[in-house]
């Protein structure tokens, strides 16, 4: 039996053990993992350095190297996230609803773990910790399949997690890593219906599209973030400047950063040139339509492909429109249903935007950078879903559960 099948089979067995573990036992395991990560920081950073050096040799972009890089502070941040996770309410066993039928049957809908979660992701080694700990908190076994670019970091982190779990009542194989990073191992994971209850891809558009297209197991789609901000003609100038600069430049390599600004032509005629200059001063490359070029000749003419691209860098597309209807049409045509924002003082336009734009998170007068589990108050997330079934938006702990019905009677039979 090859690695993927063997680990899938073992994960299914472990999932049956995890469902019996108490919240206290799961929290003890999380605390052990946090402590072990701190005590073995030097080992993890040493292995991460190997990934970084190999990435530089392969010519990885600065944004990719940033996603790949770990340091002491990022590991501390991971452990702080685990400590916050411990404090969160365990959704498993929660009564979602309860009622009694006229025939005396008592029915309860209870939250239960999904079972075995598969995670396939790119670069970010922190996802290894996030996925492992969130799955453990919700009583799920997890099979991790990272990319070759982070293989040394991922192997080190999972080894550390295993050493932590050995000190607890949770099985070591509650968290398993597929070390084979070839396409064949990924494709095998896509079709492991006998063992996987759900597969969650987390990465770029190409990875996510491949998983959605080829997987036969149920998929929770964490879509790419081609996010927009529409600046309505009534938008406050300073607010618009501050929000756009934050949403683009604070951390351009993440999925909730914006990739396109859509400007109402009346607002753009007054403030567009100043906004473009402010963005360029911060290293942003602008690609715009003909109307944008007429305002600033240094802007590169945007291609059709640019409108649908998640740049994940300091590149920003600029679209000038004559109405909110044109803005909504552009966003719904090219957006990835992740996060979209409107800056406006016109409540009628805000309401129209909220009703008409199809996305997981819609903002009024705020940065799209808040689409995040911790910022929403969830405390933790496994990803940000851009699909509509099961869950949408930041996926907190309840997203990794299903429900079952518990029916209690005293001898009832159906007539």
UniProtKB/Swiss-Prot annotation:
It is found in: Cytoplasm. Its main location: cytoplasm. SUPFAM superfamilies: ALDH-like. GO terms for biological process: L-proline biosynthetic process. Keywords: Amino-acid biosynthesis, Cytoplasm, NADP, Oxidoreductase, Proline biosynthesis. InterPro entries: Ald_DH/histidinol_DH, Ald_DH_C, Ald_DH_N, Aldehyde_DH_dom, G-glutamylP_reductase_CS, Glu-5-SA_DH, GPR_dom. GO terms for molecular function: glutamate-5-semialdehyde dehydrogenase activity; NADP binding. It catalyses: L-glutamate 5-semialdehyde + phosphate + NADP(+) = L-glutamyl 5-phosphate + NADPH + H(+). The keyword Cytoplasm applies. Pathway: Amino-acid biosynthesis; L-proline biosynthesis; L-glutamate 5-semialdehyde from L-glutamate: step 2/2. It holds the Pfam family Aldedh. Its EC number is 1.2.1.41. HAMAP family: ProA. Catalyzes the NADPH-dependent reduction of L-glutamate 5-phosphate into L-glutamate 5-semialdehyde and phosphate. The product spontaneously undergoes cyclization to form 1-pyrroline-5-carboxylate. This is Gamma-glutamyl phosphate reductase. The lineage of its organism: Bacteria, Bacillati, Bacillota, Bacilli, Bacillales. The gene is proA.
């Amino acid at each position: 039996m090859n690695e993927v099948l063997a680990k899938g089979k073992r994960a299914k067995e472990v999932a049956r053990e995890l469902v019996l573990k108490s919240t206290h036992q799961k929290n003890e395991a999380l605390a052990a993992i946090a402590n072990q990560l701190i005590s073995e920081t030097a080992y993890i950073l040493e292995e991460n350095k190997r990934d970084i050096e190999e990435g530089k040799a392969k010519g990885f972009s600065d944004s990719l190297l940033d996603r790949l890089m770990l340091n002491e502070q990022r590991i501390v941040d991971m452990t702080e996230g685990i400590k916050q996770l411990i404090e969160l309410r365990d959704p498993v066993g929660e009564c979602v609803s309860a009622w009694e039928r006229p025939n005396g049957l008592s029915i309860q809908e209870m939250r239960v773990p999904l079972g075995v979660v598969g995670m396939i992701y790119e670069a970010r080694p922190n996802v290894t910790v996030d996925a492992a700990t969130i799955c453990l908190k919700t009583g799920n076994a997890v099979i991790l399949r990272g990319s070759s670019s982070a293989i040394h970091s991922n192997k080190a982190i999972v080894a550390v997690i295993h050493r932590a779990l050995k000190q607890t009542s949770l099985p070591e194989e509650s968290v398993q890593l597929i070390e084979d990073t070839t396409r064949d191992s990924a494709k095998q994971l896509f079709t492991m219906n006998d063992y996987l209850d759900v597969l969650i891809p987390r990465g770029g558009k190409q990875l996510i599209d491949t998983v959605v297209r080829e997987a036969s197991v149920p998929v929770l789609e964490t879509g790419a973030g081609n996010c927009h901000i529409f600046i309505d003609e009534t938008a406050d100038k300073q607010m618009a400047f501050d929000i756009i600069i934050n949403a683009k430049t604070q951390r351009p390599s993440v999925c909730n950063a914006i990739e396109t600004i859509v400007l109402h032509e009346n607002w753009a005629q007054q403030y567009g040139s100043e906004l473009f200059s402010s963005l360029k001063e911060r290293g942003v490359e602008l690609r715009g339509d003909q109307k944008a070029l007429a305002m600033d000749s240094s802007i590169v003419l945007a291609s059709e492909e640019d409108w649908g691209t998640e740049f994940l860098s300091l590149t920003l597309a600029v679209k000038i429109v004559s109405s909110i209807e044109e803005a909504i049409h552009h966003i719904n045509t090219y957006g990835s249903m992740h996060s979209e924002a409107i800056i406006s003082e016109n409540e009628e336009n805000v309401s129209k935007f909220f009703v008409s734009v199809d996305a997981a998170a819609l903002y009024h007068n705020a940065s799209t950078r808040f689409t995040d589990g911790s910022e929403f108050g969830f405390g933790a997330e496994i990803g940000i879903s851009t699909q509509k079934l099961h869950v949408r938006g930041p996926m907190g702990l309840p997203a990794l559960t299903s429900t079952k019905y518990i029916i209690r009677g005293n001898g009832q039979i159906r007539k």
